[in-house]
Structures are given as structure tokens and as C-alpha cells.
Amino acid sequence: MTADQGEAWIDAAIARHTRDFSTSEFLKAVRALSARYVERRGELGRRSPIDSAGKRAAFAAFFAPIHFLTARAAVHALGAHERPIRTLLDLGCGTGAVSAAWASSCPAPPAIVGVDRDGSSLAEAAWTWRQFQLSGRTRRGDFVPFLDGAAEPFLRHPSSLGIVLGWSVNELDGQRRADLLTRLSDLAARGASVLVIEPLSRAAAPWFDDWATTWIAHGGRSDLWKFEDALPPSLSALSEAAGFRRDTLGARTLWR
């Protein structure tokens, strides 16, 4: 993947999702979605954060591109793109931005399987992967039971399997998170390449340090990243207009 490919997708996503809104309407939706994630996180387990057309557009055209750029930087910093994976499971895939960042960085891009509960997000994920000429298919449902059941055919060859969870574990309740950690640790021990990406904010992911302790004890690594902010012009203009000050692209990761 070239930088131009990623920028072309970002420009296309912005054009695709802002055309039905005035500038002020779109920016209002961006701010509202940010507030939902930052100030009203307690609602996430009970109510979808993208429960309106405006919020869905804001996620697809603003937050997903930022996730893409951050994930791509983390993938390269960790060398994840050098792993010889043939299948990439994107759990809680949203619009497919995170798996697109990883898969399009690989010399031989893997086939993607994206799992999410939201049908509109899955449709957007399929569109995203097409923009990068990636092979991808979607499954609608909760990714925790998927990993324990329907995913079994993909788990038979763990050494060629990648699993990514980008900004999705923080939306689970405590018991499902605990079950997921056990499952991911087992798959990583069997040879799967597992990448978890979460926000820098400890308030957003207060469980992360406990996960990191367990992950490191099983041979993985935990990192905190602050990458130089290199938003393309179209995304930078939206960020500034929305009133966000952004000097770096940050995330915490678990990798094995």
C-alpha cells in the first residue's frame, strides 16, 4: 500500500459521508460522537454509539480514518505487516479501517473476515476493503461467541492467522472481556498473530493494565504509542473545524 492509497480512501470516505449534511451538521455529529465515547462511556453497553445517520457518518468519515492512520503506524512499528498471515480476523470491525491498515501493508495481503453487530458498519467495511482492492467478507454478530464457535474453520492453521481488535475490547463488559483474554492468549500461544489496539486514555480502558500484565507474562508485549500527527489535508481541515487539537496519533497496543 502507498500513502496515496490511504489518502485516496480517506478523501473518498469524507466525500461519501458528508454529501448529505451541511458542514455545521456534520461537525455537530463529530462532536456528539466524541462526547458519547469520552463523556458518556457508560452508555456504550446499552446503546450503540452510532445510533443516528449523523453519528454513523461522523464515525465513517472522521474517526475511522484516524483509526486507520493510527493502526497503520502501529502495524509498521511492530512489524506486524511482515508476518506471513493468510487470514485476518477483524473482531468488532466497524467500518473495516483497522484491518485495511494491516492487510494493505502486507506484501501479500491476507483475506479479511470482519465481524460486527451493526449491519451498516459491515456494509461500510465491505466498501472500505474494495477501495484497497482487498479480499474481505463480513459476518454479523457478537465477536466473542464468534471466536468460540463460527470462527473454528479459521483457527485450524493459527500460524497463518492474524487477529485484530481495534478500539473494540473497551466496549465489552467485564466477564466477556475476561473470557476474551483467555481465548486470545490461547490462540497467541498456538501461533496466531494477535494485535489489540485501544485508546491512550485510562478512563476509556481501565482494564488495559491488567490485560497487559497477563499478556506480557505469556510472552507478548505492551506498548504506548504517540505517532507524529500526519493527517492528510481533508481530514486535518475537519479536525480543526471540529475544534480538536491533535499533535499526535496515540494508542496503546498488545501484540504477540
Predicted regions mapped to residue ranges:
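Conserved SAM-binding loop of SAM-dependent methyltransferases across substrates and taxa
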Residues: T95-A108
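Class I SAM-dependent methyltransferase Rossmann-like catalytic core
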Residues: G45-A74
